[in-house]
């Protein structure tokens, strides 16, 4: 069988019971609390924030000797060597023709590769000079600063929709603030702050130019209150006359762009702005924006964008709070807030083992989080598990020889400064036995706490307009002995037509029914109902009705799904359905990383790479099975899963208006 999207070939005595009739009921009750501004006024920030010249969050060039005592000799030498490799760096040009690639053919990689490499180089050169302080990297640093200041736009072409004239070339008269304009602003602000007088000795206009460009491109734009969608203001005042699709899009709560950009805005203004009044108002304004992110945030701390985005969602929120805490000498401190703690702890609840994480929605199964970031966040909120997780990841990765990805000094400097503390901290892999996140409606359960041995299942309910949404209400993933068996394919490579990608369709998520070629629909109303979670001893049960994920007119009255995990024994997937009209075809997919053995009717055996195996049992009188081989053409997916995936298609026999079945995994 051939498909257009890929090459395909046919082949749980404590009882906790929570019933949710309406998704996000708890979370919505939280709206309007404005956590960050309780007692924190513009005047507070004016009085408490230190002057840029007095604030020394990390040793700058005038105290460069401190780094000799902070870093190990090996770490120090590696960082200097990285800078040495950039001596005489030929700063690549960001050409207009390459900038236009996105508008013309959807390619964003060509430009981004050039832009990011320039910033990576500048960051590495500054680290080298900061450690060594001999002046030999200064020419290249100045060239990098000037080169970046000369760019028409600090962001990327794919984000020019914020520009009045739309995508294409950047309008110098209409600077917009996207992720990477904000990142670049923060980079240059840190360079100015760290290098200080050393830049003035080359020429006083260098630091002046940095301020002028940040003021023009960032400060004044934000002060004009542009109400960008990432700021989260629009969702409160949506025109009721708009179509459902348009309203749904506008009503979505802001995603990771909000705290990510906010953290860079805060570092820029705290490091550069000398005017007390302006600085205080700007900080207050940024926190007003961040409140739009926190107010509707799920009260359970769950990140519906997935663990892959946690580093720029909850963790960027941490960056914001930590920056201002430092800048006010701890007068501003929100780390005792329960939501902030839960947001951080999501990361270990989403950890499966062996480097794998939950990857519902547009996330990847394996992601490299900064061990230091997890450790520091855990230390700030008093989470021993987070601290132990950070130390575990650091030791697993052979310490902190490598810097975190990207060019953010907001992340790199603490990574260096606290490195010895992290490497000597208590460590443990965070293998929790079970968890239930009621607001994002995600459950996880493993056979044995603190061990990857045996079965692990994660499942979700929710709705089909979650951040970075895939149509996956009712889906689940199964691991055995820490290895993936039934998977969520996860994120693919972003393109202009990514919204139409096969990875988003429910037809490629575990046991989500395809009924007469109809699949789950996209939108907030397409959601799970009658959701409940019960844990009783060694038995965990998760129930939901997924019928509302189809159009009302389709005639699906109910599709009740119960997932039961009997720890140490088996996982049961039990469904019962009811149609108002007769249906001809029902197919249940399962996504696999290995070719299964289906030689015995009623059994599908899936072998792991360690030669262990699990058996998925079904009634052969109810289903016949066929296997499709999916040759992966998306390099991002292939990087995670290899070149090939398999889709088991369970085709129902003798379809009636009412029915039920059970699949057993053991």
Which residues does each predicted region cover?
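Bacterial Sec-dependent N-terminal signal peptides
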Residues: 1-32
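Solvent-exposed loop and edge beta-strand segments that line ligand/cofactor-binding
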Residues: 55, 106-118, 130, 165-181, ...
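Structural helix-adjacent loops and short alpha-helical linkers that scaffold large soluble proteins
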Residues: 129-142, 191-214, 269-287, 324-340, ...
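Helix-terminus loop motifs that line ligand-binding clefts
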Residues: 85-86, 135-179, 183, 294-309
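Well-ordered alpha-helical scaffold segments within catalytic/enzyme domains
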Residues: 120-136, 182-202, 261-276, 315-330, ...
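Active-site lining segments of carbohydrate-active enzymes
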Residues: 167-306, 416-427
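Carbohydrate-active enzyme catalytic cores, enriched for enzymes
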Residues: 314-486, 534-536, 640, 651, ...
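CBM-like, beta-strand-rich accessory domains located in the C-terminal region of large
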Residues: 27-30, 159-163, 393-402, 492-666
């Amino acid at each position: 069988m051939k498909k257009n999207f890929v090459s395909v070939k046919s082949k749980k005595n404590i009882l906790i019971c929570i019933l949710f009739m309406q998704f996000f009921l708890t979370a919505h009750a939280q709206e309007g609390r404005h956590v960050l501004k309780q007692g924190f006024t513009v005047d507070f920030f004016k009085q408490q924030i230190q002057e840029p010249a007095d604030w020394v969050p990390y040793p700058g060039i005038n105290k460069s000797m401190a780094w000799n005592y902070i870093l190990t000799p090996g770490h120090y030498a590696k960082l200097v060597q990285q800078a040495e490799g950039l001596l005489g760096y030929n700063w690549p040009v960001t050409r207009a023709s390459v900038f236009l690639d996105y508008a013309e053919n959807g390619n964003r990689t060509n430009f981004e590769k050039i832009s990011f490499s320039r910033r990576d180089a500048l960051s590495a050169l500054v680290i080298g000079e900061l450690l060594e302080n001999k002046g030999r990297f200064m020419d290249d640093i100045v060239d990098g600063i000037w080169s970046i200041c000369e760019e028409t736009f600090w962001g990327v072409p794919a984000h020019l929709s914020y520009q009045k004239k739309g995508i294409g070339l950047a309008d110098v008269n209409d600077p917009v603030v996207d992720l990477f304009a904000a990142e670049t602003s923060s980079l240059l602000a840190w360079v100015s702050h760290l290098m200080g007088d050393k830049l003035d000795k080359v020429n006083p206009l260098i630091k002046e130019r940095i301020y002028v460009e940040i003021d023009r491109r960032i400060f004044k734009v934000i002060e004009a209150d542009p109400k960008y969608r990432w700021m989260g203001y629009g969702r409160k005042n949506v025109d009721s006359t708009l179509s459902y699709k348009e309203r749904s899009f506008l009503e979505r709560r802001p995603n990771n762009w909000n705290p990510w950009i906010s953290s860079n805005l805060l570092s820029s203004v705290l490091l550069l702005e000398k005017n007390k009044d302006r600085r205080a108002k700007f900080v207050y304004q940024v926190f007003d924006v961040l409140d739009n992110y926190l107010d509707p945030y799920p009260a359970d701390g769950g990140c519906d964008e997935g663990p892959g985005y946690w580093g720029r969602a909850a963790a960027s929120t941490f960056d914001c709070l930590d920056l201002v805490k430092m800048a006010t000498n701890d007068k501003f401190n929100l780390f005792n807030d329960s939501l902030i703690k839960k947001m951080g702890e999501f990361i270990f609840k989403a950890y499966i083992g062996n480097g794998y994480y939950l990857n519902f929605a547009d996330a990847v199964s394996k992601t490299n989080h900064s061990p230091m970031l997890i450790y520091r966040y855990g230390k700030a909120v008093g989470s021993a598990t987070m601290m132990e997780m950070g130390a575990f990841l650091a030791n697993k990765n052979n310490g902190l020889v490598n810097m975190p990805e990207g060019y953010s000094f907001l992340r790199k400097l603490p990574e260096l400064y606290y490195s010895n503390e992290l490497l000597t901290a208590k460590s443990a892999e965070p293998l929790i036995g079970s968890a239930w996140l009621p607001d994002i409606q995600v459950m996880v359960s493993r056979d044995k706490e603190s061990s990857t041995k045996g079965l692990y299942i994660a499942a979700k309910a929710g709705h089909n307009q979650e951040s970075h949404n895939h149509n996956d209400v009712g889906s689940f993933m199964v691991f055995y002995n820490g290895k993936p068996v039934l998977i969520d394919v996860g994120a693919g490579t972003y393109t202009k037509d990514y919204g139409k990608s096969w990875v988003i369709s429910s037809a490629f998520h575990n046991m989500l029914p395809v009924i007469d070629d109809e699949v789950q629909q996209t939108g907030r109303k397409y959601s799970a109902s009658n959701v409940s979670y019960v844990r009783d001893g060694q038995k965990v049960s998760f129930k939901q009705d997924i019928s509302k994920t189809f159009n009302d007119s389709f005639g699906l009255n109910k599709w009740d799904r119960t997932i039961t995990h009997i720890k140490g024994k088996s996982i049961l997937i039990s469904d019962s359905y009811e149609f108002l009209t007769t249906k001809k075809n029902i197919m249940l997919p399962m996504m696999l990383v290995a070719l299964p053995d289906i030689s015995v009717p009623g059994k599908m055996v899936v072998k792991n790479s360690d030669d262990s195996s699990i058996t998925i049992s079904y009634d052969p009188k109810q289903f016949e099975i066929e296997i499709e081989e999916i040759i992966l053409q998306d390099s991002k997916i292939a990087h995670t899963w290899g070149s090939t995936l398999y889709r088991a298609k369970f085709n129902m026999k003798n379809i009636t208006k009412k029915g039920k079945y059970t699949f057993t995994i053991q």
